[in-house]
Amino acid sequence: EKLKEKGDIALVRENDKDYILIPDVATYIQASGRTSRLYPGGVTKGLSIIIVDDQRLLNGLKKRMKWLYEDFDIKALEEIDLDKIMREINEERARVKKILSGEIEVEKAVELTKTALLIVESPNKAKTIASFFGKPSIRQLNERLVAYDVATGRYVLSIIASIGHVYDLAVKVGEYGYGVLRENGLFIPVYTDIKRCVKCGYQFTDELDRCPIRECGGEVTRKLDVIKVLQDLATEVDVVLIGTDPDTEGEKIGWDLKVLLEPYAREIKRIEFHEVTRRAILEAINKPRDFDMRLVEAQIVRRVEDRWLGFALSEIAQKYFWAEYCITKLHEKLLKLMKRSKQLTDLPDCCEKNMNFSAGRVQTPVLGYIIERFRDQHDPEKYKYYVLIGVNESIIRLEVNRDVFLNIREKLREGEEVTSYVKVVGLKEEEVNPPPPFTTDTLLEEASMRLGLSSTRVMEIAQDLFELGLITYHRTDSTRVSDAGIAVARACLEEKYGDKYKEYFKPRTWGAGGAHEAIRPTRPIDPDRLRQLVREGILVLVRPLTRQHYEVYRLIFERFIASQMKPARIVKQELEVKVNGLSAKVERVVGATDKGFLEIYPEYLEVEEEVKEGEYPIVNVIEVKPPLARFHDVIKWMKTQGIGRPSTYAKIVQTLLNRRYVELTPKQKALKPTDRGVLVYNRLIELFSDVVGVEVTRRLEEKMKEIEEGKRDYQDVLRELFEELKVKIKENMEVIKKLEERYMEYCGGIKV
């Protein structure tokens, strides 16, 4: 019966046997593809006419085709101008015939078809895009670079990946050797190609043949090799299309590529897409734009500021803070060695720079927040106290003061029965709207809470899902939903509820217009269907999906579909709970008269059992310390404070872990500061609070935004930042003197 209700497969009975008829998508693609042909002028127009003898199978064909091609549609014959289409087909075929017979020269025919080089950042993304246009020709250009050649109709396209950034600021040039020159009142950043250690992955810009990390010394690859390949390819094509990510960082990578390829290319255009789908790629190719120099300038300022402040503070941390930490931390060990008359072999190392110490404008306040949460856990004034009341199979948790907590705890320890009285005030009904779809910070928060994943891992998974064409761009602070997104939600709800889908569907844009969108699925494929399509080989992805990929996709899918559904109507029970002379109001969600979006997203609200009035036992009392910060707490705090960006949320936390300033607790996976982290933070706040504080960091983010919006000149901001660097750090003699005096206390008698 359920199969009959689906409306996209047919159940028939012939010769006393039952059959299930399912549309054959692969055969349809193959057959309809024969109506078009590739020729020197492009791809001929084709027409596929389907004679329908069972509407259910047509519905099934349309649904299954949309799984593979999100913009696929079938139109009724009366909706199109058949004569016009046939005329265009016949004219085009006559043209092909003339080309083949030699009446039209091939060179003239190909004028309509251009060759293009499409550069994206990721090899997986390049491979995914190529798969949209048939089976590509593959060219292995060197050990790392592969080009995929396909035909899109308008273009013969070579698709290749730059593999991320190609250039970064040089070192040992400019003011303080930080890679920025000052000439005629202007700041000129000096860039060079990035080098990367094959062994440990360390990236740098020094002109070195081996990895500079002492313990490694591995072989090095350099982006100059990538650039040379791209320059050669640029000479072969009519136009270079740069399709790097649609954010400030992507704009800067694209601009670097433009500058490097300009002497070799006839024409260079920027294309922008927010999802890796066939429709989005074709739209972007057909609507190229110029580079947004405001975004490029904002990213230049971000990188220069990061270099200036990061290098200046890190140099101090690597020498002065490391020496203090190392010697004070090893003090006990050194005393033991002295008692045994052993040489202090550890001490000289304490007085050499430790390159794993660093500091930065954003990471410092984030470290401070983690430390504050740790200190709160050890502050009795921040503790909370609860009594747990046993109500049938559930628990009512009621907050009480410390005196009540101690009194009841003593009674329970002595074996006394302690009760509470629960009075039912009444029931009330409320309407609850669904939450908006995910932004970067809310996705990181949800995945951390529900899946226990680190922010770095979530961003890796989201990057994979984006590059595979399964979700929209994942570095976003927008909740906006496009018409294409609303269409995805409609199709999913229609699949789930059939003709009744309109009862559940309530489309919302969740924000004003703009380029950026919320994180959402790109196609109407639910998580279970995705797993099935991949398993059966119907949906072929360029890399395998893990269990965690499916889990994160489920979060994104359910949150998005819920955001396009009607509100829920829930029932709340109001209670008055009396304990030990105290009285408190308690509300519990006990049901729903209309589940609405909770049908898809039940985790949003916890539904508990309805309570009857009466006396109930207190089964326990608990003392709750403020919890340590977890990944989602840090991300939420950064968002609230206005520091950091979607592209840096995960990186900041990972940097603190890499520097061993914080560590993960084994069970809770919470963030706990280490001794070295506390020392570095304390010294930074003591000496540079006006540089690394929350407020000054937030103001800098606002300045970056003003540059992006064209409200501030980026050179003016660079001048302000340089003055800050000079006055407050590099030439702050009071601070330098204090640092040197401390250093001499620890290392003055040691020859290094």
Please tell me what each predicted stretch does:
Residues 3-9, 21-30, 34-65:
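Conserved segment of the helicase C-terminal RecA-like domain
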Residues 12-18, 46-50, 112-116, 198-199, ...:
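Short hinge/gating elements
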Residues 49, 53-54, 70-105:
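Non-catalytic, charged low-complexity extensions flanking SF2 helicase motor domains
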Residues 78-86, 100-105, 111, 208, ...:
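C-terminal or mid-to-C-terminal helical accessory/interaction module adjacent to the motor/catalytic core
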Residues 108-315, 321, 365, 606, ...:
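Intrinsically disordered, low-complexity regulatory segments
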Residues 154-159, 166-192, 199, 347-467, ...:
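Long, highly charged, low-complexity internal segments
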Residues 472-498, 651-688:
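Accessory beta->alpha helical hairpin/"wing" motif in late/C-terminal subdomains of nucleic-acid enzymes
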Residues 499-522, 690-736:
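Leucine-rich, amphipathic alpha-helical/linker segments
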